[in-house]
Amino acid sequence: MASVFEDAIDTFLGPIKDLLENDKVSEIMINGPGEIFVEKSGLVFKASNKFSDEESLQAAMRAIAQSVGRIIDSNNPRLDARLPNGSRIHVVIPPMARQGTTVAIRKFSKEKLTLKDLIAFGSISADAARFLDICVHLGKNILVSGGTGSGKTSMLNVLGARIPKTQRLLIIEDSNELQIKADHVVYFETRQADPTKNITSVSIRDLVISAMRLRPDRIIVGEVRGEEALDLIQVMNTGHSGSMGTVHANTPVDSCTRLETLCLMGDIKIPPDAIRKMVASAMQIIVQCSRYHDGGRRVSHISECIGIDQFGRYLCKDIYRWVQTGKDHDHGRYVGETVPCGYIPTFFEEIIINKLPFPKAKFVPPDWYRKMMEPLATTTANGNGNGNSSKAAA
């Protein structure tokens, strides 16, 4: 199959072959034959590459579909697939795509990042990284939240690599993107239905149910975006501590609300209040990943979900957050740092009992941050704040 794919690249994807082979390009976006954009270092640029016409672009996409055993035509106008080289591709053809065949190729990264790499990139501080390492070691359930392209999968890869090698991991994804190094790991991937071949679909929810019967120590779901959220919550609440997943949301509080909404999408009817309590109980640590306007991907918040307040709102306390302090105009990059917010997690005693080297002083915010936050604290105390519980801890 790989040779068919390579032949398809040589024959049909000549106009973008240099982009596919350029390691600095992370994503290729085709908006019809004459308009191609690429993402480099988190920023999007217009490329000079072009296809000769719509017919040649569609021919290229049909060849790609064929190389992965799929069809894209008027009856099947959308293609979502993983290519043999690991890249993800999504295609929509006319008339659904009015400006011409539209394609997004997210290239597979051969580079396996570590926490040290994220520290070197400025995505997270050494103390915050060490704290996350401890959370993994202690078996805390972790939800990685963020928008598209914010680095959620990379973070999940990094955290998964810190799981003790003696534990059995079951990893479930729509398309294989995670590359977690472990001695005892099993990968599952969903399958789309193909009525022409009498092939039924296998969903993430199906695989979560199977995973629970395969004696996992931890279950990792690459992306939670449907009714399988309820199954993951139940996994986390029934003895499989240290499980992880990602979700699309903009803040720690929003990530909990998003999970709650996804849980309610299924056929199992559970009262919303009960779902909310289950989510609050399961989600212990939330790692919020964000992509900033300078192209940088950073951990904007590390928060602990400690329950629900008297009004039924999720209580998420920031432990660390990234704060912008300036801008490097020469390089167009934001300047900032990850700072502790002054909140000590409820499981700090576990850190002490396990003799993990992380003193309470690591949670004390710097003076400049405290002074910066004093006006906000005063406003909130006077009842004029916005009530964002994820920021109240600061």
What kind of region is each of these model predictions?
Residues M1-I9, H301-A394:
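NTP-binding/hydrolysis catalytic cores, primarily Walker-type P-loop NTPases
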Residues M1-S48:
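N-terminal anchoring/assembly modules that precede and organize ATP-driven motor systems
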Residues T11-D18, I64-A81, Q167, G266-D273, ...:
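Active-site phosphate-binding and catalytic loops of NTP-dependent enzymes
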Residues A129, G139-I142, S154, V158-A282, ...:
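Switch/coupling sub-region of P-loop NTPases
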Residues G151:
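Conserved glycine(s) of the Walker
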Residues A274-Q310:
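Phosphate-binding/switch region of NTP-binding enzymes
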